[in-house]
């Protein structure tokens, strides 16, 4: 009885070690041809974000459109939208400065097109607009904070 338990334990350990291997995630298709870039890129200012509108290339291998920018701290942000739509929402602008935004078309083999560079600037971020209306009042055992979130954004 004790030897059966040992054999079952050893078999379980053998299965656990045999199952541990590195899986490499890579695209199913593999070509080296990049898609054509997106065209006619325009944007609309929104509170703390911009909404890009573009014309998709007529590549049947197209998978998504990506846009990336680097903030003032040097952190790079990338946003993606499916090829089923021609708009892309880029969020996270903490101020109203001008940023350089690169827009790419990406195919099923993860080949990026040549970048389309545009200069964008967003409206006042929702957090900053809410901070300007912040009121602090004394209350029993503490304070009461109130503010107006006119853009109804997630703060």
Listing of model-derived features with the role each one plays in the protein:
Residues 120-155:
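A charged, solvent-exposed segment within the mature domains of Sec-exported extracytoplasmic proteins
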Residues 63, 88-118, 155:
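Beta-strand-rich modules
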Residues 39-45, 132-137:
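Short beta-strand segments of immunoglobulin-like
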Residues 77-84:
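Short beta-strand segments within Ig-like beta-sandwich modules, predominantly Fibronectin type-III
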Residues 43, 47-60, 141-154:
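Conserved aromatic anchor
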Residues 21-33, 107-130:
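Extracellular fibronectin type III
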């Amino acid at each position: 009885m004790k030897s059966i338990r040992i054999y079952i334990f050893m078999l379980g350990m053998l299965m656990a070690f045999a199952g541990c291997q590195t899986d490499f995630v890579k695209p199913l298709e593999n070509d080296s041809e990049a898609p054509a870039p997106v065209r006619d890129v325009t944007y609309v200012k929104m509170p703390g974000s911009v909404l890009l509108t573009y014309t998709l290339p007529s590549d049947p291998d197209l998978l998504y459109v990506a846009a990336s920018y680097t903030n003032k701290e040097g952190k790079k942000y990338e946003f993606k939208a499916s090829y089923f739509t021609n708009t892309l929402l880029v969020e996270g602008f903490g101020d109203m400065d001008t940023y350089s935004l690169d827009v790419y078309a990406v195919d099923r083999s993860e080949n990026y097109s040549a970048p389309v560079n545009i200069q964008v600037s967003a409206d006042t971020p929702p957090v900053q607009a809410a901070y300007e209306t912040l009121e602090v009042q004394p209350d029993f055992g503490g304070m009461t904070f109130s503010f107006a979130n006119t853009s109804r954004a997630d703060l």
